[in-house]
Amino acid sequence: MNQDNFKVSVAICTFNGAAFVEAQLESILAQSRSPDEIILCDDGSTDGTIDVVKKISDKYPDKIKIFQNERRLGSCRNFERAISLVTGDLIFLSDFDDVWFPEKVATMIRVFAEDPGFVMAYSDAVITDVELRPTGTVFNRRKDTDLRKTPSLQQLSRGVAFNGPMMAFHSRLKPFVIPFSPLSLQWTHDHWIGYIAYAVGKIGVIERPLVYYRRHGKNEGGDAEFDGGLLYQWRVVKKKYQGSEEYGERRRGWEDMVTRLHEIRNGGLPLSNPAKLDKLLQVSELCLQFAKARQMHKTRGRLARAPSALRLLFAGDYHRYARGVKSFVQDLLIP
């Protein structure tokens, strides 16, 4: 398919991003291959984000459409809304605080033009500080996100293999991924999309960075994955997991994924690799069983839960479906 025949949409979500959103929108508008539409959904910003955006959108009224949520949806649901509103063949996701390389859109379009079997294109990114000073690349700094090597199914299930600003996906993926699981503790929007994309089609990997991924302490994503400090990672873990209810959300998140994969398999929509879907479904069902076991032993006191946690550790489940010893220690120590 000719590259010019694709309609390109950008789904961008904002929340109190006045300090960064102008630079991001300018980088999108300055693409060597300009997107055809930009759908921006704001989740109740109170810092003047909308004023900044409107100054830019007034110059491009036919390209930029702004939607303001009547109530806060949260990042995952906000992206679900934005994706449901786009009308393009290819969908690019954008956080409000990153900056795209000028050739990002053109480079990622080529993946789909050269092979119609691809449902997603995925690139590397340059990690930066708040002032866009580079500190490394995602593929080199974050072990489980380097898609240059085919990830194991267990690696995908651990939840860190996909980052929204690094992906573009074909619109034929929309009926598979929407609606999202409502339990964002288990599934961020990008992990949900990437996991299902891997199940139903092919992902084309671009080995060079096409976006600056800005870290500033308020990112929606999992910054702990980039930080080597054990104390920092422990604080993040302790903040995220505080009791059996959170583990219940993770269990229900895996129930949502297993249900969705069964619906896809039985729904009659064309798949490029049904065998791969079946394998990922099997792994997802094992992840669900593991999540149920973790939830069960978290309802007990620390000493009482130790035997069941040790059984999971020695069986290898913590390494297959979680983060190994880190998750084991987390389950023992956090109430």
Regions found by a protein language model. Give the residues of each.
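Cell-envelope/extracellular polymer assembly enzymes that use nucleotide-activated donors
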Residues: 6-9, 37, 192
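Short, well-formed alpha-helical segments that are part of the catalytic scaffolds
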Residues: 17-30
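A conserved acidic beta->alpha catalytic loop
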Residues: 42-51, 71
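Glycine-rich, basic loop-to-helix element that forms the pyrophosphate-binding segment
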Residues: 69-86, 151
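Conserved nucleotide-sugar donor-binding catalytic segment
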Residues: 84, 149-229
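Short aromatic/hydrophobic "clamp" motif used to bind/position activated sugar donors
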Residues: 91
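Conserved donor NDP-sugar-binding/catalytic core segment of glycosyltransferases
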Residues: 104-136
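Membrane-interface aromatic/basic loop that binds lipid-linked glycans or pyrophosphate carriers
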Residues: 266-335
